[in-house]
């Protein structure tokens, strides 16, 4: 998932499908998608499921999953990126950026010969 996709999520974008918690990546007026094929449903497991459950457990006084980065008109993914990169630098030092995780995931999926259409469904194309 691209950072802007996640940053612009609504709480209602987290849905249950066939008993599995998923995130529905779709365009919103405040955040478009890079391509039409970027719209997708991503199943959440492990720490991503845990994080989604924490978001959904918060008081629902705001429709956004990350209200700090949304004003209803625009998603500020650059601010989210800067905050995450600052946090990451404090944890593992220089030389890593948050955007690298998406590319690492795609590289690891290719390394285990995951079909490219599945890689695109997970990471967007």
Ranges and model annotations:
Residues 36, 98-99:
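Residue-level marker of regulatory loop/turn positions in helix-turn-helix DNA-binding domains and
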Residues 9, 54-58, 112:
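Residue-level signal for well-ordered alpha-helical positions
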Residues 5, 86, 100-125:
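C-terminal catalytic core of tyrosine-transesterase DNA break-rejoin enzymes
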Residues 28-29, 45-94:
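Active-site/catalytic core of tyrosine-dependent DNA strand-transfer enzymes
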Residues 20, 39-41, 61, 93, ...:
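Active-site lining segments that contact anionic ligands and/or coordinate catalytic metals
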Residues 13-15, 19-24, 61, 83, ...:
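Active/binding-pocket-proximal capping segment
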Residues 4, 8-53:
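Conserved tyrosine-mediated DNA breakage-rejoining catalytic core shared by Y-recombinases
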